[in-house]
Curated annotation (Swiss-Prot):
This is Activator of 90 kDa heat shock protein ATPase homolog 2. GO terms for molecular function: ATPase activator activity; protein-folding chaperone binding. The keyword Chaperone applies. It comes from Bos taurus. GO terms for biological process: protein folding. SUPFAM superfamilies: Activator of Hsp90 ATPase, Aha1. InterPro entries: Aha1 (IPR036338), AHSA1-like_N (IPR015310), START-like_dom_sf (IPR023393). It holds the Pfam family Aha1_N. Belongs to the AHA1 family. GO terms for cellular component: cytosol. Co-chaperone that stimulates HSP90 ATPase activity. Keywords: Chaperone, Stress response. The lineage of its organism: Eukaryota, Metazoa, Chordata, Craniata, Vertebrata.
Amino acid sequence: MAKWGQGDPRWIVEEREDGTNVNNWHWTERDATSWSKGRLRELLVGITVENEAGRCEISELKQVEGEASCSSRKGKLIFFYEWNIKLGWKGIIRESGAKHKGLIEIPSLSEENEVDDTEVNVSKKKGDGDILKDLMKTAGTAKVREALGDYLKALKTEFTMGMILPTKAMAAQELTVERKLSENALQIQASSRVALGVRIPTVALHMTELFDTAIEQLYRIFTVKDLVQKFSKSPAVLEAEKGGKFQMLMETSPVNIQNC
């Protein structure tokens, strides 16, 4: 016998959550007949279709014969189901108010055929009312097949819950994934606290202007409010003293006068 952790990887030598028939590895079968009958009744009875000619409703599940089961073998699920279903429907013609009844028969719902290929036969009792029969053959049949598809989805998901149990390695892997997701969430939360924005590089700009005039005249141009306003052709703010405000163009920001 191989020691723990040794041997061909195809050998099943590992600790499992359950002890007997580990992870249902050997053949395990669960009867789904009773569950299926109840689910088929829930999904099929009450289906309604209507158009401008009339309205029809599946009123009862007259017969459901057959069986269904789900088997587990080496971690794989195998489904078996075979049903013969008869449904009763009733309808009313809008114009005349006449009421009619009929049957829907599904002779063979099994895993051998796709739901869209499943035979659905619609019949009606003698008399008028073929427009209701046609309604059930078209829209009614489509809704019946849709309900059968919902039954098969439920059989393969809801009914099989717990049939394949996780191994110890799978459980540890799931725990690692959850831990990584939690760590990623914490990192995202931490990074979200950092102030958002884009750092823009800036430089200092120094400019020198040469004025071809006398110093006294240049001084007056920048210290006499009337001369500043004539130069800028706009109102100006001028306080010719240390710390005073100087604003030559109104749309620019004011500056403070410093010693030169």
